[in-house]
Regions:
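Helical element adjacent to the flavin cofactor pocket in flavoenzyme catalytic cores
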Residues: 144-209
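Glycine-rich FAD pyrophosphate-binding loop
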Residues: 1-18
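Short hydrophobic segments within beta-strands
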Residues: 6, 90-91, 148
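Short, hydrophobic/amphipathic alpha-helical packing segments
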Residues: 6, 59-67, 159-163
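Local beta-strand N-terminus motif with an aromatic residue
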Residues: 2, 74, 207-209
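Short, flexible, mixed-charge acidic loops at enzyme active sites
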Residues: 19-23, 134-135
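Dinucleotide-binding Rossmann-like beta1-alpha1 core, especially the glycine-rich loop
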Residues: 21-127
Length: 209
């Protein structure tokens, strides 16, 4: 197989993956409450955990993959694009505080999340995230959980490194090229019509997939 990558811009990762357009969170389920839904089990209110386990496992596999690419000298040292960062989930108001507490009770029993910490007091919360209490009413109900080995990822830098790796192993990168049409042929292959800034007219490429 030969693989071709077609990029409309002059370099890869300049849109969604660009650092200015991407939050950079390493999504591992550590601090995303929407991955844990409230439910009732054995007559007791709790939260689901299946989705956070799946997401965390997927992210850990991604980290292993990046580390393997780095070991093979195909991408830069991971320190160039991934950094350890606290991941904090925040709940404000009685309902959210109760949800964060339920979430904590479920997560701390799971091996992937057993280092999770819960803070219900203002003093600890100010140490974890000082700005949360700036200008806030001291009577507010606030809950936080923290996992200290979360990550911040520069997905733009990572994507550029992976594109470099792609070309190192023989990948064909076409910059300033836009896909104009994609049609499946009778033989099951695909006819790709492209337009490049450097060539007049359109070009056609046949691909297996």
């Amino acid at each position: 197989w030969k693989i071709m990558m077609i990029e409309r811009l002059g370099s890869a990762a300049e849109e969604s993956s660009n650092g200015f357009n991407n939050a950079g969170t390493g999504h591992a389920g550590f601090m995303e409450p929407n991955y844990t839904k409230e439910t009732v089990k054995d007559g007791k209110a709790t939260v689901t955990h299946e989705k956070i386990v799946t997401i965390c496992e997927q992210f850990m596999l991604s980290r292993q993959y990046w580390a393997n690419l780095a070991r093979k000298k195909l991408i830069a040292d991971p320190d160039a694009f991934i950094h350890q960062s606290d991941h904090i989930a925040l709940g404000i108001g009685e309902d959210q505080v109760e949800f964060i507490k339920k979430r904590f009770e479920v997560m701390k029993k799971l091996p992937l999340f057993d280092t999770i910490e819960l803070a219900l007091d203002k003093e600890t919360q100010e140490k974890w995230a000082p700005l949360i209490w700036e200008g806030r009413d001291p009577s507010d109900k606030v809950a936080m959980t923290r996992i200290k080995y979360g990550t911040d990822v520069d997905f733009g830098a990572l994507a550029k490194e992976k594109v470099k790796a792609f070309t190192k192993v023989g990948g064909d990168l076409r910059l300033f090229t836009e896909v104009k049409d994609v049609k499946k042929q009778a033989d099951g292959r695909w006819l790709i019509t492209t337009k490049s800034n450097s060539v007049k007219g359109t070009q056609q490429i046949k691909a297996k997939f």
